[in-house]
Amino acid sequence: MALGLFTLQLVSAVNQSLSNAKVSAEVSRQVIQDVKDGTVTFNLLAYTLMSLFVVYFALFKARSHRGRAALIVFKILILFVYVPLLYWSQAYIYATLIAVILLGRFFHTAWHCWLYKTWDFIVFNVTTLCYAR
């Protein structure tokens, strides 16, 4: 299931439906091939939308203290709960893409934290000079 989250479920549902309908082997092969072509197209669209969302999520800056705290918690949960769950369900490309984007942004802001000796860069999710009130 390396192509995406729903590919395996869709193909298995089609296989089960074809076996229940008792169609010929030739028709069955043709339907399965058509479904695989459709899932590849669906996965390309899903990858694009997912990667745009993850980049937006990685770069988003909340305005309130509660929002900033929630974003940090969500990013940690995504990295330590959701990404391993994706790897476990064999969605390797999704998991790797999410982990690389979020860790890349974290390390980019962490570099500025180390350089200027303040945690505000990670808290505010910015890389420009940042001063807390």
UniProtKB/Swiss-Prot annotation:
It is found in: Host membrane. Keywords: Host membrane, Membrane, Signal, Transmembrane, Transmembrane helix. Residues 34-124 form the CoV 3a-like viroporin TM domain. It comes from the Viruses. The chain crosses the membrane at residues 40-60, 69-89, 91-111. Residues 1-21 form the signal peptide. It holds the Pfam family Corona_NS3b. One of its GO terms (cellular component) is membrane. It is a multi-pass membrane protein. The keyword Membrane applies. The keyword Cell wall biogenesis/degradation does not apply. Disulfide bonds: none annotated. Belongs to the coronaviruses NS4a protein family. This is Non-structural protein 4a.
